[in-house]
Amino acid sequence: HRLAVIASFFLSLAVIASYFISVYQEMNTPKVDIVNTELPKYSPNGEKYLHDTINNTLENGFYLWRNIAEIELVTAWNKASNIPFYAVDKRGQEIKYTIYRYMTSMGLRKDANSLSQLRRGDVIRIENGETTYLKYNLFEKRLRSLIFEFQQYKQTKNPNNQTLIQRFFYWKIALKTFSKHWFFGYGTGGYKEAMSKEYKMAS
């Protein structure tokens, strides 16, 4: 019985690890698509596209930071939604980036023409903070969110706005600060100043 429990435990771990690896690989594999391979200089409305070819973050296999015509997108979005482009969505995220991620997940360029292809239901989902048009169960949604945070941290080296990574980063700073003066401490207000110095050194 004990061997069966142990075998079942390791089998479960193997299944979870295999699932994680498959999701991670899928999230890091760009699709062979014209949106990824062709980088036009201008949008159909004449705005110059932003193409960041250094940051290779993907959303559903499409590059997030390419094909961006923000000026015309602001106008188009503000006509489609009551939440302004530079405000936050209903989850407290900057809706600008929610729009970028959602449109990218659909394989669309981030311009006015592409925004016009969104249905009312898509606009509502973006307003509610959904970053992809694909629907996942709660476990996979959280897993993909954590992988995305890790990808962003790898690209930018900035732990801010990455919930789990940000916690680990500040715990690491706190432990490092504490270890330097664990016996005598820092005195009144000194700990915050020491934490701030460690943060600047680590950033």
Annotate each PLM feature.
Residues E26-K41:
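Alpha-helical transmembrane signal-anchor/signal-peptide segments
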Residues F85-V123, E127, K154-K180, F184-S203:
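Long extracytoplasmic/lumenal interhelical loops at the membrane interface
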Residues I16-N28:
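Membrane-interface motif at the C-terminal end of an N-terminal transmembrane signal
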Residues E38-I147:
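Extracytosolic and intramembrane catalytic regions of membrane-associated proteins
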Residues R2-S12:
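Membrane-interfacial entry segments at the cytosolic side of transmembrane helices
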